[in-house]
Amino acid sequence: STSRRQRQMCIRDSYWWGEGEMKFYIDGDDEYPTICGTGTEDYFGGSWSFAKQVDGKTVEQNYNTPYLGYPYYSAHDELIHNFYHNDDCPPMRGFYRWHIQDPICFDEDLRVTIQQIGVGYRGLFERQDDVASVAYWYQTHPHAPFAPLMSKEDRWPR
């Protein structure tokens, strides 16, 4: 196939945000998705946060790879240039993941959701964050017919 699936996401919020699951509802999935991840940070390659301790403080660690990365972090609003206000703001983060080596295949429809769960001083909680995402679909025309997909049950991880 000549199609490519890619996803980018930006998150602006305070405290840890990465416990929510990425869910891919494929070809008529209703209540339960065909693909359900283990956490937002896992989906973008963090596996165990994106931070390390430096002199007793938590420091975010950016990274870039060919297929996923975390290239952007800032707690400063670069658009604020005002004598009466500093540029502090809630942390902003930018991630990407290209589904080239692990395409999400579907015949009719695809719905992707992110569950917003975070951790604060009281433990896990449902969040309401500013999240923006972009998904790309590339396909050249004309093209040969795609091979039929296996049933969604046959595509489940083993």
Regions found by a protein language model. Give the residues of each.
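Preference for intrinsically disordered or flexible, low-complexity segments
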Residues: 1, 14-17, 24, 88
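Short linear, low-complexity motifs centered on an aromatic residue
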Residues: 20-22, 157
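Extended, compositionally biased non-globular segments
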Residues: 22-139
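Intrinsic disorder/low-complexity detector
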Residues: 1, 27, 134, 139-158
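Serine/threonine-rich low-complexity intrinsically disordered regions
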Residues: 9, 74-76, 151
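Single conserved hydrophobic/aromatic residue that forms the stacking wall/gate
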Residues: 1-7, 11
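Structural helix-adjacent loops and short alpha-helical linkers that scaffold large soluble proteins
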Residues: 12-18, 29-32
